[in-house]
């Protein structure tokens, strides 16, 4: 069973480490390099505990970290970042976590992917629990829907 919880300020270090794993996985697509300190970094991370429209979430399975979501609330709500550790992929963890996050914020949503990230596009097409519209922006596909 997947537990989705708001990431508390004292969980920032765990989330920062999960973001490093996410950035490492994503570097196959965006060709990002690590910084001189050996980290990819995520400059906006601290804003998720400061700005009221940003919300960080952690996913756990049996008490173990399994991934995260970073949500920017608005009209529409935006799934800014979403990551599931490889161990938990293709097991239903991602879909359950995504749907739990959508349920926390009823109303209009969007999920976005880069054109090169076809696996993410396929994932979101399965994970969105309602009918959705899909279009593309300059970076890739965007799904828009309303969560109840």
Positions of predicted regions on the chain:
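Active-site beta-strand termini and strand-to-loop segments that position acidic
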Residues: 60-62, 145-148
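Conserved GNAT-fold acetyl-CoA-binding loop/helix
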Residues: 20-45
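Conserved acetyl-CoA-binding loop-helix of GNAT-fold acetyltransferases
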Residues: 84, 90-103
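A short helix-loop-beta-strand connector motif used in the catalytic cores of GNAT acetyltransferases and
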Residues: 44-58
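A short beta-loop-alpha structural element at the N-terminal edge
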Residues: 2-18
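Conserved beta-strand in the GNAT
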Residues: 56-58, 64-73, 78, 83
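Conserved beta-strand-loop-alpha-helix junction that forms the acyl-donor binding cleft
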Residues: 110-125, 129, 137-145
């Amino acid at each position: 069973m997947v537990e989705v919880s708001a990431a508390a300020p004292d969980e920032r270090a765990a989330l920062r480490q999960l973001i490093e794993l996410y950035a490492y996985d994503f570097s196959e697509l965006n060709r990002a390099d690590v910084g001189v300190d050996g980290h990819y970094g995520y400059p906006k991370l601290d804003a998720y505990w400061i700005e009221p429209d940003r919300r960080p979430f952690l996913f756990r399975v049996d008490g173990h970290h399994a991934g995260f979501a970073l949500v920017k609330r608005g009209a529409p709500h935006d799934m800014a970042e979403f990551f599931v550790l490889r161990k938990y992929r293709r097991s239903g963890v991602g879909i359950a976590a995504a749907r739990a996050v959508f349920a926390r914020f009823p109303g209009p949503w969007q999920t976005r992917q880069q054109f090169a990230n076809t696996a993410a596009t396929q994932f979101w097409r399965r994970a969105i629990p309602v009918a959705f519209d899909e279009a593309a922006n300059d970076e890739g596909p965007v799904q828009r829907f309303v969560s109840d």
